[in-house]
């Protein structure tokens, strides 16, 4: 799990205004942090297939949110991709 301080940091970095916790950018950034954390977990726990299922769900959810953002706000999408270092 992501630590509370780390979560607050991510929210403050990607929030569009003060108190924004549900914008698409914030959701994608939080999911991305969880995905990176799970990838580190799999380096030492190669046979954890149950968690791998959860990882695939998170990747799918992130992809859907990215597609939505690309469809609605292309400029914000490009900025987010660059900030998070995702390939697209």
UniProtKB/Swiss-Prot annotation:
<dbReference type="GO" id="GO:0022627">
    <property type="term" value="C:cytosolic small ribosomal subunit"/>
</dbReference>
<dbReference type="GO" id="GO:0019843">
    <property type="term" value="F:rRNA binding"/>
</dbReference>
<comment type="similarity">
    <text>Belongs to the universal ribosomal protein uS15 family.</text>
</comment>
<dbReference type="GO" id="GO:0003735">
    <property type="term" value="F:structural constituent of ribosome"/>
</dbReference>
<dbReference type="InterPro" id="IPR000589">
    <property type="entry name" value="Ribosomal_uS15"/>
</dbReference>
<keyword id="KW-0699">rRNA-binding</keyword>
<dbReference type="Pfam" id="PF00312">
    <property type="entry name" value="Ribosomal_S15"/>
</dbReference>
<keyword id="KW-0689">Ribosomal protein</keyword>
<keyword id="KW-0694">RNA-binding</keyword>
<comment type="function">
    <text>One of the primary rRNA binding proteins, it binds directly to 16S rRNA where it helps nucleate assembly of the platform of the 30S subunit by binding and bridging several RNA helices of the 16S rRNA.</text>
</comment>
<protein>
    <recommendedName>
        <fullName>Small ribosomal subunit protein uS15</fullName>
    </recommendedName>
</protein>
<dbReference type="InterPro" id="IPR009068">
    <property type="entry name" value="uS15_NS1_RNA-bd_sf"/>
</dbReference>
<dbReference type="GO" id="GO:0006412">
    <property type="term" value="P:translation"/>
</dbReference>
<comment type="subunit">
    <text>Part of the 30S ribosomal subunit. Forms a bridge to the 50S subunit in the 70S ribosome, contacting the 23S rRNA.</text>
</comment>
<dbReference type="InterPro" id="IPR005290">
    <property type="entry name" value="Ribosomal_uS15_bac-type"/>
</dbReference>
<keyword id="KW-0687">Ribonucleoprotein</keyword>
<comment type="function">
    <text>Forms an intersubunit bridge (bridge B4) with the 23S rRNA of the 50S subunit in the ribosome.</text>
</comment>
């Amino acid at each position: 799990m992501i630590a509370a301080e780390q979560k607050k940091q991510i929210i403050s970095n990607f929030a569009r205004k003060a108190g924004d916790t549900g914008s698409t950018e914030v959701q994608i950034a939080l999911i991305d942090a969880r995905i990176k954390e799970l990838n580190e977990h799999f380096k030492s726990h190669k046979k954890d297939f149950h968690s791998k299922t959860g990882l695939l769900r998170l990747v799918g959810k992130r992809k859907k949110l990215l597609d939505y953002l690309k469809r609605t706000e292309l400029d914000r999408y490009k900025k987010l991709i660059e900030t998070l270092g995702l390939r697209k």
